[in-house]
């Protein structure tokens, strides 16, 4: 995203950029999350999946998997549950 600062401002207060195309690995596969932010007001990670096509049930299932993996592998004990957002 070229205009990252503008994008963050549109999200609202408290967002900090963490990663772009962050890899999450399991024993059998690697997955890549388009954008990862941390909201220090909400105390949680926010995962964003960018889609260029119509939203499908598979997209929703994929985001659910990303959120569960992120909660298991990255979220700290003091963090609130991860939020997943799909932008079409």
Question: What role is predicted for each listed range?
Answer:
Residues 1-88:
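Charged, terminal alpha-helix-loop-beta segments
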